[in-house]
Amino acid sequence: MDKIKHKILVLSGKGGVGKSTVSSQLALYLSHIGYKVGLLDVDLCGPSIPKMMGLESKDVHKSTKGWVPVYTDESQKLGVISIQFLLGDKDTPVIWRGPKKNSMIKQFIDDVNWGEIDFLIIDTPPGTSDEHISVTEELLKHNPDGAILVTTPQAVSISDVKKEISFCNAMKLPIIGIIENMSGYVCPHCSECTNIFSSEGGKLLAEQCNIKFLGKLPIDPNLSICSERGINYFTEYPNSSTLASLKSFVDNFNFKSSTTTTATN
């Protein structure tokens, strides 16, 4: 963990807001612009990262230095760890009580050999359950940058994110900012973005709570197709508005470390 420059949790108070999509695409984007990245999936009961990254058939193995991540590329710029890699069948449910989940999360934090990387993005399940307490407590031992909170524009999602803000404050976990996901719909034919839900909810919440608003991510059918098929969206659609949104998020980050990280291609 001490060899990882930036450690970021991705949280949401509600399921279905696209948190795993944000986590995976943020990791892919950072890798795309030259950083070395790790993506840790701690959603033990509903791991979706392996499918999104096209790694469903892969297995993880242990070395003398710990678990070795599954890499998406030969240059090993993006490594992934998920409970899915440890299950013999992707349809096998994880029926564990809290203590066993907590033990697994501790191993994910302490026993993975990420090597020297620039970013570790940690995708979490929705809510504020045992998993969140465990991963936050373990991560706070290693000076994390903080959490990115994901919401959709609707009031019901924003209400749940307020609880997530209270959770972060109670745990003394810094909040990097809020991302408003599903903010508008990108036409796959003309690329025009149209609001189909209410808008600005995430931005208003950020202003109310004095939290940085990182930006909006629209619904993009092409992104959805790539995630379903495990295809790298950025190589398929290099001029997309989604890529521009992710660049804006990264530009808006306030990193905890005083050392500036420089991407290398």
Swiss-Prot record:
Its cofactor is [4Fe-4S] cluster. One of its GO terms (molecular function) is iron-sulfur cluster binding. Pfam families: ParA. Its main location: cytoplasm. ATP binds at residues 13-20. Keywords: 4Fe-4S, ATP-binding, Cytoplasm, Iron, Iron-sulfur, Metal-binding, Nucleotide-binding. Binds 4 [4Fe-4S] clusters per heterotetramer. Contains two stable clusters in the N-termini of nubp1 and two labile, bridging clusters between subunits of the nubp1-nubp2 heterotetramer. Heterotetramer of 2 nubp1 and 2 nubp2 chains. Belongs to the Mrp/NBP35 ATP-binding proteins family. NUBP2/CFD1 subfamily. This is Cytosolic Fe-S cluster assembly factor NUBP2 homolog. It comes from Dictyostelium discoideum (Social amoeba).
